[in-house]
A protein has these predicted regions:
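Membrane-spanning alpha-helical segments of multipass transporters and channels
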Residues: 1-179
Length: 179
């Protein structure tokens, strides 16, 4: 998003555009995409699998989408090229499910180090807490991965969003005329 437009953005900044204005336009555009995608996924999943906690599931979908979107925007803002940003973002998104613990339990030695960075874990773990009690108990019985309370999950996903936005601002603010 940013890495591919770096040369144009630098010219605009030279002409007087503030980094916050550029970031604001990106955040507005991407927020609309996050909302549309999250509502679509929620409608699709809730239609076929209504197991309770609809609003909670929607909020976790929105936060997970926003976290990944804004972290990838941050990567694009600090990357040297669009290719580098794309590759790093693909790896980040691609490793979310295997490292979340939702499919396979991670070794305890690795889990504590990796878990704070995996948005998919926080959305999944928090979303599980909103299931109907019989479904929640059934899921809990087959899981090897520990679940975290929903409030903690909301906070961590909010921190992911904030870190992505902060990295984006830092990357946009820094001049890179060598391009």
């Amino acid at each position: 998003e940013v890495a591919g437009e770096r040369a144009i953005m630098e010219k605009e900044k030279y002409a007087g555009m503030r980094p916050s204005a550029y970031l604001g336009s990106k955040l507005a555009y991407l927020s609309v995409l996050v909302l549309v995608q999250s509502v679509w996924m929620f409608a699709f999943v809730d239609f076929f699998w209504d197991r309770g906690g609809g609003l909670t599931h929607l909020l976790f979908l929105i936060l997970a989408d926003a976290a990944m979107t804004f972290v990838c925007l941050g990567i694009s803002s600090v990357a040297r090229s669009a290719d580098q940003a794309s590759l790093l973002s693909i790896y980040l998104v691609g490793f979310q499910l295997p490292l979340s613990g939702a499919v396979l339990a991670l070794p305890e030695q690795v889990e504590g180090f990796i878990r704070p960075f995996i948005s998919a874990y926080w959305a999944w773990s928090g979303s599980i807490s909103a299931l109907k009690s019989d479904v929640y108990n059934a899921v809990k019985n087959v899981l090897d991965t520990d679940l975290t309370p929903a409030l903690t999950c909301y906070i961590v996903l909010g921190v992911h969003v904030a870190c992505g936005i902060a990295a984006s601002y830092a990357g946009i603010r820094r001049s890179r005329w060598e391009l």
